[in-house]
Amino acid sequence: MLEYAIEDFFHFLRIERGLSDNTLSSYKRDLTNYLQYMKDHDKTATWDKISRTDIMGFLYMLKDQGKSTATISRHISSIRSFHQFLIREQITSNDPSLHIETPKKDRKLPDILSQDEVDRLLEIKMNTKLSVRNKAMLELLYATGLRVSELISLNVSDLHLMMGFVQCFGKGSKERIVPLGDTAKHYLEKYISEARDSLIKKNNREDALFVNQHGRRLTRQGFWKILKGLTLEAGILKTITPHTLRHSFATHLLENGADLRLVQEMLGHADISTTQVYTHVTKARLKDMYQSYHPRA
């Protein structure tokens, strides 16, 4: 059965590759679509029978469904990894995905906040335990550029305030050390000393750094709800995503002369080309500023 090979592949990704739940979910979604297409087209005997033409048919179906270039590219990547696994495990000697080209993605510059907008967002009135937590969270995000998944995965033991850094685990469980500024340190100390113990209440075995009103680890959805509320309070009309502060962190560093390699290291990017997108953001902002303020623009 075709399904068994896919289940073995997921086990390999989880145990041997140590991929995160989010990444595993993406693989599962992509390969479930792929398997269903093959079943719908009577390709259910063995993976040996799958051809390049079959895969191209699947990709054309995705295109006809209006899927984005990025989504199609991700499916291709998942399919390639799966067929390489089949060869590695000697389930098949045929790799029909070998010469399938990935479509070129349209470069979409990430949305960022201006320095003034960041300042407005971070002007949180700390009149409740939860607002003290929110202030500490956003100050930490803007100070470090952490991914939201990294933020909510932090434990208290990952925070090293005396030494001025936070220890986090990014994609593929790769560890990195990110420095903290004095402002973020101050509000984290305030949160830990004044709010966290009250929030965890009787759930004092909770290791999570950031917890919800029930004393349990904050979820991604919970963080997103908080961020949307704070954005409205700050009167920011831009469309904000959970990664907006990460994008703003990187762009503001580069605008102020930071070295690209250092920004890459702080963001935890494996490939510097991923970080280079932020240099395009700074150039676009510079062009906009020129057009707005130069008398002969």
Curated annotation (Swiss-Prot):
Q: Boundaries of each Tyr recombinase domain copy? A: 108-291
Report the locations given in the UniProt record.
Cytoplasm
Keywords, in A-Z order: Cell cycle, Cell division, Chromosome partition, Cytoplasm, DNA integration, DNA recombination, DNA-binding
Q: Which GO terms describe its cellular component?
A: cytoplasm
Annotated disulfide bonds: none
Q: Which GO terms describe its biological process?
A: cell division; chromosome segregation; DNA transposition
**One example GO MF annotation:** DNA binding
Q: Which Pfam families match?
A: Phage_int_SAM_1, Phage_integrase
- What NCBIfam families does UniProt report for this protein, alphabetically? PRK00283.1, recomb_XerA_Arch, recomb_XerC, recomb_XerD
Self-association and partners: Forms a cyclic heterotetrameric complex composed of two molecules of XerC and two molecules of XerD.
Q: Which family does it belong to?
A: Belongs to the 'phage' integrase family. XerD subfamily.
This one is known as Tyrosine recombinase XerD
